[in-house]
Amino acid sequence: MRLDRRSILKALGGAALTLPFAGLFAKTAEAGPTPATAKRFIVFYFPDGVPAPAGQASRFHASGGETSFTLPENLAALAPHKASCAFFRGLTMGGTDAGSHPGGAKKLLTGVDGGGGESLDRYLARSALGAAPFRHLYLGAMATQNNASGDKFISYPSAGTTAAPEDDPMTAFGRLFGAGGGAPSGGTTTKTVDPVEASIIDAALGDMNDIRARLGDVEKAKLDLHLEALRDVERRVKGLASGAIPACNQSLGSVGNIDTTRLYDPSQFPEILRAQIDLTVQAMACGLTKVGVVQASQHTSELIMSRFPATPIYKPNFDMRSHQASHYGVMADPKFEEYSKQRTWFVEQFAYLLAQLAARPEGSGTMLDNSIVLLCSEISDGNTHSHDDMPFILGGGAGGALRTGRLFDTAGRRHSDLLGTIAHAMGDTSISTYGQGGQGLLPGLLA
C-alpha cells in the first residue's frame, strides 16, 4: 500500500509539528528546475564594531585579491567555511551620523539614515520569500537588557519603528513548537510549554513509529534527521531550565516560573546565544520560518565578556565590557587585545551558525548551500566609530545565486547596494539597491 502525504500529516498531529513536516516527504522527482535563489535569510549581529585602527592592518577584514586572499586572526574560525563566504572591503554606510552607535544601528538593515525605512529582513519576510507559519523570527541574547531603547534594535517593521527581540530561548521554543503559537518577534502568549516535564515531540507524535516503519529509506532518513535535530534543541532548552545553568531553579515547573533576571547574567550568555542559534536553525529546518535575526547583545554593550566561562576571554574577578574594550585608545592599551579576542569569539559563534546549517542535508546539498547569512555590526572600528569599511560578511551559497569564496573590493560603495544584491539573490529582481545612496547591484557578487 502506498503511503501518501495526507496519511502522514494526519498521523503527525499537532499544528506546530504538522506545518514543519508538510513539505518533508515531497518526492524529489516532483520538484522541477528552479531559479538560482536562496531559500532563507539569517542576520547575525554583534555589537561595537571591530579592531580596524586607521593606518594599521585590520584584524577583521580579509586582505589580498578576489580569489587569493587571507583571513586575519579575528576570522580564523571561518577558514573551514571560506569557500562558502563572501568577504568585503570598502563598504560604507555613509557620512550621516558617522561616529555614532545608534546612527549605525538605524542604517544597518534599513539602508536609510535615521532608520527611515523598513529593514531588509522585514521586507524579505513579507515579500520575496513567501508565506511561512512564522513570517519573521527575531531572537536575542541580552539584547533587551536595561530596558533597552528602540535604537538598540536593528529590525524595523516600518520606517522609524523597531521591534524588540525575544531574549528568552524557552519562551521562543514554546512559541515555535508548542501549542497555542504566538508571535515570535515579541509580544506575549496565552499558553506556554513546560520544557522540563513534557516532550512536545513525543506528545504530538504518539504513533510515529508505526508511520516510520512504512516509509522508504530516503523519507525515513529525512524524518529521523528532523526529529533528532528538534529533540536536540528541546534537550538544550530543558537544560537551561533544569540545571545546566547552575543558578536556575532545578524544580522549575513551567516556563512562566523562570527567573528571567538570569537571562542577563553574563556567565550564561554563551549558552543562551547558542540556544537561540539552535532554535533559529531548527525553526528553518522544520519550515517554520524563512527569515531570522539573531542579535547578540546591543550596541554600546555593557556585556561583561570576561565572565564567559571556559573561553579564552574568561578572566575571573576582572570585568571587561564589550563597549569598554572597544574604546581601546591606542593599540598598546591592554584593552585592544581584549577587544580583539572578544571579536574573535563573536566570529566563532557565527562560524557555529554556519556549521549547523552545513550539517543539515537539503536537496543535493545542505541548508547552508541554500541560505544567505549576514554577519554585521553597527560600526567599523570601535575606537573611531567609523561607518566606513564596514565589517560585513556573507555566508552561504544562496542556492547558487552568489559567487562565494571571494573578497570583493567595493571601493566605497554604499552598503545599500549589498542589501539590494541580497534581495536580488533572494528572488526579488525588482530592486538593485535597498535604501539610499546606492548605485546598483554589487559587481561580481551575483552568479
Task: For each feature predicted by the language model, list its residue ranges.
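Ligand-binding pockets and gating/stacking loops
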Residues: M1-A447
